[in-house]
Amino acid sequence: GAVKALYMITGAPPLVPRFALGNWWSRYYAYTQDGYLRLLQRFEDRKIPLTVATLDMDWHWSKTLDEVKKITELGRNTEFYGGNNGWTGYSWNTDLFPDYKKLLRDIKEKGCKITLNLHPADGVRWFENQYNDMANALGKDSSTGERIAFDIADDDFINAYFKILHKPYEKDGVDFWWIDWQQGEKSDLDGLDPLWSLNHYHY
C-alpha cells in the first residue's frame, strides 16, 4: 500500500546492475598493460569469475607526473598551473598502457566491466590531452596554461566535464567511474557537497 503509493509519486528506485554483485578486482598498484591482462588470465585459469576490472589512479600520469611532464623543471609547480600533484588526471599513462584502447577491448573480451579511479578535485591542467578543448568550451585562454578549476556548481563546467573528459573514454570501453573522495565537503554553491553531486551526475 504505502510503498506502492510512494513509488507512484517518486518512481521506482534504480537497481544496481547485476554485474555489480559479482567479484571485483581492485588493487592500488602500478600495473602495466601486459601485466594486468596476465593477472586477469590467472583468474580465468583458476576458474575464478570476475565481473569488474578496476584500474586505480595509475591509469593516468600519477607517480611519475612531475618527471614526465617536467612540471617543476618548467617552473610550473605553482597554484596558477595546478602544481605537480598526481591525484587528478585524465591522460592515459602511455608508459604503462601504450595502447589503452586495445587494453579495454582485451578486458571486455574476458567478460569484465571496466571502471577507472577518479580524483577530479585538481581540475584540468595544462599538460592534459583535453586541456585545449576544455579551455575552449569554457571560454578560457589556453595559451596561459592556467589550471581549469573543478567547479561542480557550474553548469558549463559540468557539461564540459562529461562531454570532453569522460564520454570519449566511455566510447572506448570504460563502463563507469570510481569516484574516490578528494573534493572536500564544500562547493561554490552553499550546501552542495561535491561528492554527493558527483555521485548523482555520474549515476
Task: Locate each region found by the language model.
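Catalytic-domain carbohydrate-binding cleft regions of carbohydrate-active enzymes
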Residues: 1-203
